[in-house]
Amino acid sequence: LYERMGEEIAARGGIIRLHELVREIRPVPGGLAVRTRSGEEIFQRVLFTPSVPMLLQTVPSLPDGYRAFLSRIPYQANITMVLGLERSLSPYYWLNITDPDSPFVAVIEHTNLFRDPDYGGLIPVYLSRYLSPDHPFYTMKVPALRERFLSHLEQLFPHFHREWIQSFTFSKAEYAQPVIGLHYSKNKPSFQTPVEGLFLCTMVQIYPEDRGMNYSIKCAEELLCALGELERLTA
């Protein structure tokens, strides 16, 4: 899906810059200046899709009242390990782990839902945990955290052997998921920010849906409709 989207963007004259870091967005005469490691460019409109805390860091000119409004939305962090196994753990795609002693809350075996030959014969197993950024797991060294995860995996699946692991990756994100509280619909941020030409379209606006690819596309379509751009871009 991402490759196809990239092809379509390029075909319509868009430019995708991978591994670029946006340091600041600020209003200037004629539009918005976007400063990156490579320099500065001016655009008439900017659509911001990362997390709300990153918006607050990147756009210093946001009004104090708007900053306070967005700062009331709490976030959870996430840590994920992906094991490339030579054998399957179970016949199930998704297992929620409710044991309070478990270091992870989900075991996801993707190939039980969809087998992709691009995995090179390996079976990817996702071990995921949502947590507060001040939880010890978030700053724990990866080897120690890996040992905690694998030890508990052996308890859940006694037939599992560590020799099955042919690849291993670890990732974490401080702002992985906004926490939706009571009466959130009354406080859900709009797409338009107080800065002219700057729009926000991110997970805080997917409510009342849950996080997911389909709903992120729906959210983008709603923004394009609000801007009057959907018909032009889909023509």
Feature locations, PLM:
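Active-site catalytic microenvironments for nucleophilic, acid-base chemistry
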Residues: 8, 15, 54, 61, ...
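A structural signal for the hydrophobic beta-strands that form the central parallel beta-sheet
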Residues: 16-18, 48, 200
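Mid-domain catalytic core of redox enzymes
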Residues: 20-125, 130-139, 143, 148-160, ...
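A general secondary-structure junction signal
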Residues: 18-20, 26, 169-174
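A conserved beta-strand/loop element that lines the FAD pocket in flavoprotein oxidoreductases
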Residues: 9-23
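Conserved flavin/dinucleotide-binding core of flavoenzymes
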Residues: 110, 114-235
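Helix-loop-beta segment of a Rossmann-like dinucleotide-binding subdomain
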Residues: 1-12, 130-132
